[in-house]
Amino acid sequence: MSKALPLLTRQGERIAITHGLRTPFARQATAFHGIPALELGRMVVSELLARSEISPDVIEQLVFGQVVQMPEAPNIAREIVLASALSVHTDAWSVSRACATSFQAVANVAESLMIGHIQAGIAGGADSSSVLPIGVSKKLARLLVDASKTRSLAQKLKLFSGLRPRDLLPVAPAVAEYSTGLRMGDSAEQMAKNHGITREQQDALALRSHQRAAHAWQQGLLNDEVMTACVPPWEQPFEQDNNVRAESKMQDYARLRPAFDRRHGTVTAANSTPLTDGAAAVILMTASRARELGIAPLGFLRSYAFSAIDVRQDMLLGPSYASPLALDRAGITLADLSLIDMHEAFAAQTLANLKMFADERFAREVLDRPRALGEVDMERFNVLGGSIAYGHPFAATGARMITQTLNELRRRGGGLGLVTACAAGGLGAAMVLEVDS
């Protein structure tokens, strides 16, 4: 175990997370159809400020992320500042770390707090899979640039005369890794085969995720951390995630065909997280600033870590690499955790990471650690369900997980929680959260 690295300001104060909020998450082309990520982000930041009753002038920085970026608003963070009640003098910039984007946003605000540049900031992310930057072919794009340099209609017509009908077809955003051409689901299939994870195991985890998420909603556990959204055509408010299947059964999952490896695969639409729209954000500040404002924090950021691995083999094992680092930096072990929340991009990916947490050979030969983290107690794991049930607006998921875990720790009387995620490009993220008893 490496030496613990406490996250403290120069004055020795802890980094407090005082508030967290998200929109309900909506499956692609449903409740948020036509609502861009920028509007979702503005919506959640505005409501977060209103609920916190913190003066907008207190917030000195906004770090916000978006994975599927819109060309017309490349700095979503600054646009949210300008569209919300935040002061126009609020510093703002955008980040992208694929599915770990809001983890990165939280880390950036925490770093600003630690070095003393600010005393309070907001971190979060938003994504829309319903409002996408549909592009044009490379040939047409090049001709459009060339045409802008011509002077006469004849010159323009000559340029476009070489176009073919296929050159005019719209081009959707890529769903594959740029470096390998593999889709996320292809990597999940690879991991299922490499780690001996069966279709039944994947379906069982997916069913568990939906059952626990449905129970969380039924018990009102999420009411205070999910806002009601009112969007066009203003017919009715949108109050709960619409992907959670409360009545599903194992036989329902067994009926679906593989989505990626059609002949021999085990990854289906049901044991994967769906394309989703939504936004989430948290407020961070120094412990002293929270005291000055009379705010009791939800909890504290104890440590964080990021990792990067080869994209060609087990690309989604990021949690198995980042989590040991985060635990080391927090000065704790797996046994010290009250809760573990892992992003469920796919059931296969989640189960593979759980295996690697307990794999002694992986620890010694791959991580160069003397021992594995250990077996995960499933009674502490994704206790309210995970991304398979809630959905996954890429840049918003981390902030959802952080808020959800802090609130659950508070319900349990305090403790330590690990939140961790894989991300495209072979990236991983992990954070240790702390709630005082």
From Swiss-Prot:
PROSITE patterns recorded? THIOLASE_1, THIOLASE_2, THIOLASE_3
NCBIfam families (alphabetical)? AcCoA-C-Actrans (TIGR01930), FadI (TIGR02446), PRK08963.1 (NF006516)
Disulfide cysteine pairs (residue numbers)? none
Catalyses:
an acyl-CoA + acetyl-CoA = a 3-oxoacyl-CoA + CoA
Record's Gene3D superfamilies?
3.40.47.10
User: What's this protein's family per the entry?
Assistant: Belongs to the thiolase-like superfamily. Thiolase family.
Q: Which CDD domains match?
A: thiolase
Task: State the active site.
Answer: C99 (acyl-thioester intermediate), H392 (proton acceptor), C422 (proton acceptor)
User: What organism does the record attribute this protein to?
Assistant: Erwinia tasmaniensis (strain DSM 17950 / CFBP 7177 / CIP 109463 / NCPPB 4357 / Et1/99)
This chain belongs to which protein, by name? 3-ketoacyl-CoA thiolase
